[in-house]
């Protein structure tokens, strides 16, 4: 598996983890957990963009 594909898989994992935390924070009225989820999703989006750039440069 290429580095770009590995990064893409990690990015998807971070986005899923972030969405889960965000939803859990909403369900339990936990603003800190919700913020963590949004941060994790943003990290996943950034990593996804980097992975796309790596894949397009090959």
Curated annotation (Swiss-Prot):
Family in the record: Belongs to the UPF0337 (CsbD) family.
Cite the record's Basic and acidic residues compositional bias ranges: 1-22, 30-46
Q: What is this protein called?
A: UPF0337 protein OB2685
S-S pairs: none
Origin, by domain of life?
A: Bacteria
- Chain spans, region Disordered: 1-58
